[in-house]
């Protein structure tokens, strides 16, 4: 996924060799700069992996919450029905058949 978008890897940057010209860049300066770029790439890759794992974890949590939400109303309706039935039975017992005559 990410490999399709990124053109260079840390290893490719490390192994890249530049041709030297008559008045080329200082090789030491280029090497130091490339070392910094490599460290940044490695840091970014670690952060991306961490965020992908976190994203996967949160996606699973969301799926579980949605599934639980789908099941919850069915349990609630059954519970409400049971409570109403018990209340009706208690009223019959306490007040007798006077309410239902």
UniProtKB/Swiss-Prot annotation:
InterPro entries, alphabetized: Cell_cycle_GpsB, DivIVA_domain, DivIVA_fam
Annotated compartments: Cytoplasm
Domain of life: Bacteria
Keywords for this protein: Cell cycle, Cell division, Cell shape, Coiled coil, Cytoplasm
Statement: the UniProt record of this protein carries the keyword Cell cycle: yes
One GO BP annotation of this record: cell division
Coiled coil stretches, renumbered: 34-71
Membrane-spanning segments: none
Disulfide bonds: none
Chief place of localization: cytoplasm
A single Gene Ontology CC term: cytoplasm
Family: Belongs to the GpsB family.
Subunit structure and binding partners: Forms polymers through the coiled coil domains. Interacts with PBP1, MreC and EzrA.
Function: Divisome component that associates with the complex late in its assembly, after the Z-ring is formed, and is dependent on DivIC and PBP2B for its recruitment to the divisome. Together with EzrA, is a key component of the system that regulates PBP1 localization during cell cycle progression. Its main role could be the removal of PBP1 from the cell pole after pole maturation is completed. Also contributes to the recruitment of PBP1 to the division complex. Not essential for septum formation.
PANTHER family according to UniProt: CELL CYCLE PROTEIN GPSB (PTHR35794:SF1), CELL DIVISION PROTEIN DIVIVA (PTHR35794)
HAMAP family noted in UniProt: GpsB
Protein name according to UniProt: Cell cycle protein GpsB
């Amino acid at each position: 996924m990410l490999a399709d978008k990124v053109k260079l890897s840390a290893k490719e940057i490390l192994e890249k060799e530049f041709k030297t010209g008559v008045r080329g860049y200082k090789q030491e300066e280029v090497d130091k700069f490339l070392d910094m770029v490599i460290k940044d790439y490695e840091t970014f890759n670690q952060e991306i992996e961490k965020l992908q794992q976190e994203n996967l974890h949160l996606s699973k949590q969301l799926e579980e919450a949605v599934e639980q939400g789908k099941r919850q109303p069915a349990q609630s309706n059954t519970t409400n029905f049971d409570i109403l039935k018990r209340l009706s039975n208690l009223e019959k017992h306490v007040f007798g058949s006077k309410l239902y005559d």
